[in-house]
């Protein structure tokens, strides 16, 4: 949008796994702009590969790190500058000095929007041992409040975008201990909003961005150790901290690095028109 608003010519290549959305975008662009200046190109990865052979003035890519590396490598052949908006494992840290019910609602809301398929969803929960049991209980209550006894029947709960993505996510449910949700339906690509306890840093669910309705929970005793674990991972797109303590807030802000940080809430930093994103 920034490139178009600035008056540039642009080729837009939406994802092939969301064809209905891609068609709406293609129709909207075609109705609004001269195709000689701005157009939408649809197709699978072979189309993307062909586009990457062209000499663009700039490439902007949103997606995962693996494909981001492919885009950067192809752009380097022509010395084309790139902007990569990549995902990652966005942590959510919860200290004991919180309002439990408010925090639980904001975490559940941020995690399970679009069944967890947003790039800045909290990827995993780092919760202090002192508050863990109370917070988990509050989050379980929130899930029922938001989506009812059976989330599969809720009009507010989404499905997984593709069969490939569904199968990848379902494998994560075999790790740790499911303490909420866990139900699946392959035919409709439904995965219940799930809380996953007793997860270790070595589990596969902690090795890649989840991008789905599964929230691993890891407890900690010392904030310094929690920060060290976060910093051992690649830089996250988002980071969330729930704490009323100003000193702890400053500590996390100064000792971590992320695309964006929100204190005592989730997701909402993306809505600020005064801040850059990523």
Go through the PLM ranges and name each one:
Residues 93, 144, 190-278:
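Conserved C-terminal structural/oligomerization subdomain of aldehyde/semialdehyde dehydrogenase
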Residues 33, 66-201, 223-224, 263:
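ALDH superfamily catalytic-core signature
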Residues 1-102, 220:
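Rossmann-like NAD(P) dinucleotide-binding subdomain of oxidoreductase/dehydrogenase enzymes
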Residues 52-53, 86-88, 118-120, 153-154, ...:
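Short glycine-enriched loop/turn motifs at secondary-structure junctions
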């Amino acid at each position: 949008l920034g490139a178009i608003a600035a008056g540039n010519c642009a080729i837009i290549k939406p994802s092939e796994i969301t064809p209905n959305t891609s068609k709406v975008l293609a129709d909207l662009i075609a109705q609004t702009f001269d195709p000689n200046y701005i157009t939408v190109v649809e197709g699978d990865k072979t189309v993307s590969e062909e586009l990457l052979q062209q000499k663009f003035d700039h490439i902007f890519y949103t997606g995962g790190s693996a494909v981001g590396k492919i885009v950067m490598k192809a752009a380097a052949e022509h010395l084309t500058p790139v902007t990569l908006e990549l995902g990652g494992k966005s942590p959510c840290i919860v200290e004991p000095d919180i309002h439990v019910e408010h925090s639980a609602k904001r975490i559940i809301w941020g995690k399970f929007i679009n069944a967890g398929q947003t790039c800045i969803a909290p990827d995993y929960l780092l919760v202090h041992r002192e508050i863990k049991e109370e917070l988990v209980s509050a989050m379980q209550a929130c899930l029922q409040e938001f989506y009812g006894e059976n989330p599969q029947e809720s009009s507010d709960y989404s499905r997984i975008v593709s069969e490939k993505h569904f199968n990848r996510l379902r494998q994560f449910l075999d790790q740790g201990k499911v303490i909420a949700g866990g139900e699946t339906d392959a035919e409709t690509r439904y995965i219940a909003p799930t809380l996953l306890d007793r997860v270790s840093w070595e589990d596969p669910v902690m090795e890649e961005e989840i991008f789905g309705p599964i929230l691993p929970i890891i407890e900690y005793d010392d904030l310094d150790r929690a920060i060290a674990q976060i910093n051992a991972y690649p830089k996250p797109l988002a980071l969330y901290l729930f704490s009323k303590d100003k000193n702890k807030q400053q500590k996390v802000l100064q000792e971590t690095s992320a695309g964006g940080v929100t204190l005592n809430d989730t997701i909402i930093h993306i809505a600020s028109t005064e801040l850059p994103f990523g």
